[in-house]
Amino acid sequence: MLIVQKYGGTSMGSIERIHNVAQRVLESVTLGHQVVVVVSAMSGETDRLLEFGKNFSHNPNKREMDRIVSVGELVSSAALSMALERYGHRAISLSGKEAGILTSSHFQNAVIQSIDTKRITELLEKNYIVVIAGFQGADIQGETTTLGRGGSDLSAVALAGALKAHLCEIYTDVDGVYTTDPRIEEKAQKIAQISYDEMLELASMGAKVLLNRSVELAKKLSVKLVTRNSFNHSEGTLIVAEKDFKGERMETPIVSGIALDKNQARVSMEGVEDRPGIAAEIFGALAEYRINVDMIVQTIGRDGKTDLDFTIVKTQIEETKQALKPFLAQMDSIDYDENIAKVSIVGVGMKSHSGVASIAFKALAKDNINIMMISTSEIKISVLIDIKYAELAVRTLHAVYQLDQ
């Protein structure tokens, strides 16, 4: 059975930990599995390399920065390969390019286009453990590219799909996916299995175990995911399509988890000209700046004017200001509020149960938490609230949906 294992920066964070990873990999080999390993740079190394590159330019060339930051994964993959050989097993490290990962030419945020698995397959047939540098690939010209935040997870999922691996194991420093952040709610429970769609919502709403790009790709390629702790042998969380859940579930939980995202800002535009096409123009301008808009509320127009509120990622405020400059003359005022948080309730059971939203709203009202904005999907309800109530809201909702049981 072929397994792809990915180890993150914390798991690879020291010489001792790299030896620990080698032992974990060899445990799988002992069970009779073929193993392809994808590794991140050692903890803190990517940030160190980024800062190093910035010493030479206030506006660093993206191509050159990709060449610098990609070194971190090359070092960790070579180190793990040597550790595996020390313990008596044939191993070889490959860069993203050597592993056949072809990407677009968007330096620092490239997209994987295809993977030529020939070399990896040949090495596996020769009984090698193949250790691949995550987070990177090469474009059609052979230029080194990096995949952006969470790129090593993306590398692992893409490789698992291309190799038709039985399983893709993502090793981190937590035991799996929890009903909410255990640092906020100590009664949070580990989830044994969760659907791609639920995980995608939790990831996009701020859950840190997996990023949504990786979950999206896993769903697209039907890659079975497991998130595990590299420092113990807990079962972790299985992430699959609903139809592939293991065992019989008496009833799908209405709510699977509560996610908190504090990296949000609210943009409030008052007195905007109320005419056909104004919203299309505003959001079109934001799209040109690649600004990701989430929650949107527009009031009913009166006296030829309307109010428009929406949320963005906090780090994109300056780009948003630039994008909206041409519209300032067409509104009375604009305000940016960073003191907000988004709390999301996620669960596939919402599709077949009514009243989920009212339970949340009543519970928040009881704690005097005011809701500023609301957005919903088939399996998610998100509310925007004052950031000072963020953690209280998480605990309240976790309790009201009995996720601690």
Swiss-Prot record:
A Pfam family matched in the record: ACT_9
E.C. code: 2.7.2.4
Biological processes, Gene Ontology terms: diaminopimelate biosynthetic process; homoserine biosynthetic process; lysine biosynthetic process via diaminopimelate; threonine biosynthetic process
UniProt keyword annotations, A-Z: Amino-acid biosynthesis, ATP-binding, Diaminopimelate biosynthesis, Kinase, Lysine biosynthesis, Nucleotide-binding, Repeat, Transferase
Annotated catalysed reactions: L-aspartate + ATP = 4-phospho-L-aspartate + ADP
Keyword presence, Nucleotide-binding: yes
Protein name: Aspartokinase
Protein's organism: Helicobacter pylori (strain ATCC 700392 / 26695)
Phylogenetic lineage: Bacteria, Pseudomonadati, Campylobacterota, Epsilonproteobacteria, Campylobacterales
